[in-house]
A protein has these predicted regions:
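Membrane-proximal intracellular helices of multi-pass ion channels
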Residues: 2-406
Length: 406
């Protein structure tokens, strides 16, 4: 059950070694990953396509804003576009990986290429190999293909659509503009990738990357920066990284991918809006200005609320897991940072672990399962809850009161 939930939630955590699974088992996991990766977005598209009597206008607008950055929204067309992009990207990834694995003399290069292509694009982190991708730590070609698949799966279909339309506009008279959403996603994605890669290279040079030649240190620094935010593949064991690096990795996992994507976490755009408001926002208007565009108070409030609630849920998960594994924490089998890392990885549907997943007791496994499920569906559910709460508040007026804060 643990592996099934992990696959559907596109997390990648597993309590069992991957070499115990048969070909049939891997096919089932692969289908669960594909279903889990596209399931929510497909469900949302059908949800919005329902008659207005079954879905309120407010909820319809909310889900549009949350998943699709499109002015003229047509659910069936968007769904068709999502499935088309997914098929094309995964097919190209499959062909490229098949060539790479063939040259690497992998006996099962066809099936492994298909499995890893789907897992990478869906940001699942599952691999048919026992030690994830550690066998390809020095293979620039294979890791580069996987990194591109992870990024494409993590930026969101709205961004891919916007960029494709922009490229098409160069060949037609119709002009297409890059949306503010796309600009924020690209900015945050590049910032997190570059920052993480530079940090890993400098501070893990003589630690996790100590035995690697210089080219592989650069390659694995970049790969670690990309995979740790949501994908969960690893070329090196996570318990080899120094504690300061692990803490930074936890922050990156919590941020995750971008809104409207297959990735987990609170999302890059959410963090960007909250950060912009904290340091450059109009407190009275409760809004922020970016690229000469005003981002509404509703989006600002939603961002802050999602981060706050996610942090509370994650803290509860960490506390419960610590209680469940109190004996192992006391005798030194687990460390506090192991528990925090495991819960954050589950909540952000990353799938990386410091080697404790297989040693968790029954209660701890249930906690991780619930954390994965909440992390996969929770942000969307929280957005709906926030919207409903605001609607109920708008119908009643209460006296205002002042409270000192800070």
């Amino acid at each position: 059950m643990f592996t099934s939930v992990s696959a559907v939630c596109v997390t990648g955590l597993s309590t069992l070694s991957m070499d115990i699974y048969s070909r049939t088992g891997f096919i089932i996991i692969m289908l669960l990953i594909e279903f889990g990766g596209l399931g929510i977005i497909t469900f949302v598209s059908f949800y919005i396509a329902l008659p207005a009597k079954k879905v309120s206008i407010v909820n319809r607008k909310l889900i549009r804003d949350f998943f699709i950055d499109d002015i003229e929204y047509r659910p069936r067309r968007i769904l068709k576009r999502i499935l088309t992009y997914t098929l094309i990207i995964q097919l190209i990834g499959f062909i490229l990986l098949m060539c790479g694995l063939y040259l690497a003399k992998d006996e099962n290069f066809i099936f492994n290429a298909l499995f890893i292509s789907i897992s990478a694009f869906c940001n699942a982190g599952f691999s048919t190999m026992n030690n994830s991708l550690s066998g390809f730590a020095g293979n620039k070609y294979i890791l580069s293909v996987i990194m591109i698949l992870i990024i494409l799966g993590g930026i969101g279909f709205a961004v891919i659509t916007n960029l494709v339309q922009k490229i098409k506009s160069f060949f037609y008279t119709k002009k297409e503009y890059i949306s503010v959403h796309t600009k924020i996603v690209i900015l945050m994605t590049l910032f997190l990738i570059i920052t993480g890669a530079v940090y890993n290279f400098i501070f893990e040079f003589n630690y996790a990357f100590n035995n690697l030649p210089l080219p592989q240190k650069i390659l694995n620094s970049l790969f670690q920066s990309i995979t740790l935010r949501t994908a969960g593949f690893e070329t090196l064991p996570q318990n080899k990284f120094a504690p300061p690096s692990t803490l930074l990795h936890i922050v990156f996992m919590f941020i995750g991918g971008s809104s409207g994507s297959i990735a987990g976490g609170v999302k890059t755009t959410t963090v960007f809006i909250a950060f912009l408001y904290a340091f450059n926002g109009d407190e009275e208007a409760n809004a922020v200005i970016y690229k000469k565009r005003q981002i509404s108070a509703q989006i600002v409030n939603k961002s802050i609320t999602i981060i706050s609630r996610s942090f509370i849920i994650l803290f509860c998960s960490i506390f419960l897991l610590a209680l469940a594994e109190n004996v192992k924490l006391t005798n030194g089998t687990f460390s506090s940072i192991d528990i925090i890392f495991e819960c954050t990885s589950a909540f952000a549907t990353v799938g990386l672990s410091r080697g404790i997943t297989g040693e968790l007791n029954f209660a701890a496994k249930i906690i991780i399962i619930l954390t994965m499920f909440i992390g996969r569906t929770g942000v969307f559910a929280m957005a709906l809850k926030i919207n409903k709460s605001k609607n109920s508040l708008n119908t009643v007026s209460y006296p205002k009161e002042t409270v000192m804060v800070g």
